[in-house]
Amino acid sequence: MTIGVVGRKCGMTRIFTEEGVSIPVTVIEIEPNRVTQFKTEETDGYRAVQVTVGERRASRVTAAQAGHFAKANVAAGRTVMEFRLEEGEYQAGDQINAEIFAAGQLVDVTGQSKGKGFQGTIKRWNFRGQDNTHGNSVSHRVPGSIGQCQTPGRVFKGKKMSGHMGAERVTVQSLEVVRVDAERNLLLVKGAVPGATGGNLVVRPAAKARG
């Protein structure tokens, strides 16, 4: 099953195994994912399920969105996400929660990384710094040459330079689900995941573990 869920990052903690081994985990709150639309090959050309999660004030919902949510008979959510579906059937109004995952399962977690603002090449691209002494002056953290001379007479696209860092879509693959708390809708995943506390996360079964 390739379907995933949208969750919210609660932060990190650690849990202990029966042998006393400490495992760092990220706590992800899986709020009920309400199905807003089920797409089929006959009507849409592919199979997918569209879900919404959370809440949004009525004043922030457009007329088109309000009609879409009303047709599915679900409350307006803060975001809408679509998952391709290989098997299974869903109807508008159904709910998907953390119970679709099991302890020991591998998952891919996608989120927006923390924004770092404008950063230089050392922090952004792990460039090495130049000599601190030996005649170097004011050039300790400069990137160095960014191209050739008259030929080609330009800087190539994709050149690693200073610029905005972070605030981009990042996926961490094959993280282990340590524990599933269905009563509190919590998913405990081994290791760190992208983004700040409170940010949206998309949790899917690991692509490299599906065979």
Curated annotation (Swiss-Prot):
A Pfam cross-reference name: Ribosomal_L3
PTM annotation: Methylated by PrmB.
InterPro entries the UniProt entry points to: Ribosomal_uL3 (IPR000597), Ribosomal_uL3_bac/org-type (IPR019927), Ribosomal_uL3_CS (IPR019926), Transl_B-barrel_sf (IPR009000)
A GO biological-process term: translation
Annotated GO CC locations: cytosolic large ribosomal subunit
Residue runs in coiled coils: none
The entry's keywords: Methylation, Ribonucleoprotein, Ribosomal protein, RNA-binding, rRNA-binding
Modification sites for N5-methylglutamine: 150
Subunit architecture: Part of the 50S ribosomal subunit. Forms a cluster with proteins L14 and L19.
Family annotation (PANTHER family): 50S RIBOSOMAL PROTEIN L3, LARGE RIBOSOMAL SUBUNIT PROTEIN UL3C
Family to which this protein belongs: Belongs to the universal ribosomal protein uL3 family.
Name of the protein in question: Large ribosomal subunit protein uL3
Source species: Pseudomonas syringae pv. tomato (strain ATCC BAA-871 / DC3000)
GN (gene name): rplC
